[in-house]
Amino acid sequence: MKKLLLLLAAGAVLASAGMLYLPVYPAAVWVFDESKGEVVDRIPLVTGTPMSIRLSPDHKRIYVGTIDHNGIEVIDVATHKVINHFILNTPTKQFRFWNGTPDPQGKLFYTVSKEIEKFSDHYEVGKPKYTVIDLEQQKIIKTAELGKEEQSDNDIDFGRAALEVSPDGKLLYQFGEHITILQADDFKIVEKLELAKPNFPGMEHVHFGGDLDLINEPGQHFAIFNSEDPIVHNKVFGLARFDLSTRQMDFTEVGPAPAGIAGLEVTPDKKLAYTVVENGKHGNKRCEFWAFDLTTDRITQKEEVPCRTRFTLGISTDGKKLYIYGAGFEIEVYDAKTLKYEKTWNLNVDVTYAGIVVTP
C-alpha cells in the first residue's frame, strides 16, 4: 500500500485541466500543463535532487525536500519561484529525513529525522526523532525521541510513515501500523488508534501506510488497508475511511490481498477510486488497474496494464485520466472510464519517485 489520500471536497469538481509539478533529476521541479500535454516551466532547485514534495493546505506553496544535503525548498505556486531554501547539514552532521508536512501557517515543518555525526574515525547514526524545522530561522528547533511502539513506523525507511498537522495546528498525526496522535508542541501522545481490529471478525495487523496527498478537505481520508487473520494468516485488503476531527474509522473488506497495491486515487466527486495491483514475480508478474465504486465499496472494473519495476499512480485534476509515471522519462496516460491506454508524454528527463503535486 503506497498511497493514503485525503478526500476531495464535495463541491470541487474541476472542469478544466490543471498543472502537474514533477520533481526531476538532477535538481528541478518541472511544471506540466495537462491540457497542452507539455512542459510549460522549469523551476531550478538550489539544494539538490528532490525526494519529497507536498502542497500546502491553502494550495499556495509547495514544499520540496532534497536529498543531497538534506534541504528544504519552498515554491510559490502563483509565480513558480523558489521563495525559501536552506540545508540542514553541517560539516560534521547530517540530518536525514524523507517527507514531512507544514503547519497551517507555513512557519514550521514537521518530519522524522535521523542524525548522523561524523567523527575522526567513525560515524554515529542516531535513532529517528520527531523533528520541528523553523522555516524562517532555517534550522531544527526541536526534536523528541520516539516511543518504542512508534519505532516500527520509522525504523525501516525512516520518516516514510505519513504525517499531517490538524487544521488548528495543535495536533500531529502519523499514519503507519497504527495512527498516532501527538501534541504538536511537545510530541506527547494524545491517543493511539490501533488498526488491529477492523469491524469484520478475526482480522488483525491492519496497516494504513503511505504518503498523504493533500487535496481539498482537511482531515478526511480514504485509504487501502491490508489485514490478515491470526491463525492461517489469510491476507485481505479493503477500503478505510478516517476522520481526523472525530477520530472515527470505518473499514470495509473487499477481498483477497494482491501481492502489491500502488496507491489509491480518488475522483473529485468522491464516487470513484482507482489503484494498480501487482501479482506474481519477475517473468510471471502481472499488473491490473482496479476501479472502485466508493458508494458501494466494490470493485467495478479491471484491466491489465504493463508492469513497471517502479512506478507511481496519479490522477488528473478532473478525474478523467490516470497517470503512470516515476523512475523514468515518460508519463503514460490512461482513460479512467475505460482503463485503456491513450498516449505517452515524453518528458526527456528522469522523474524522481517523490510523487507529484497537482493543482487546478
At which residue positions do the language-model features occur?
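Repeated scaffold domains used in trafficking and secretory/extracellular systems
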Residues: 49-55, 93-102, 151-164, 199-215, ...
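An edge-strand/N-cap motif at the start of beta-rich repeat modules
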Residues: 16-41
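Blade-level signature of beta-propeller repeat domains, shared across WD40, Kelch, NHL, RCC1
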Residues: 325-360
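A short beta-strand motif characteristic of beta-propeller blades
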Residues: 38-44, 81-90, 139-154, 188-203, ...
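Beta-propeller blade signature
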Residues: 125-138, 236-244, 287-293
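Short coil/turn segments that connect the beta-strands within blades of beta-propeller domains
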Residues: 17-18, 58-60, 105-107, 168-170, ...
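Short loop/turn segments that connect beta-strands within beta-propeller blades
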Residues: 34-37, 76-80, 134-138, 184-188, ...
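Short, conserved, GDST-rich strand-edge loop motifs in beta-rich repeat architectures
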Residues: 111-127, 219-234, 276-286
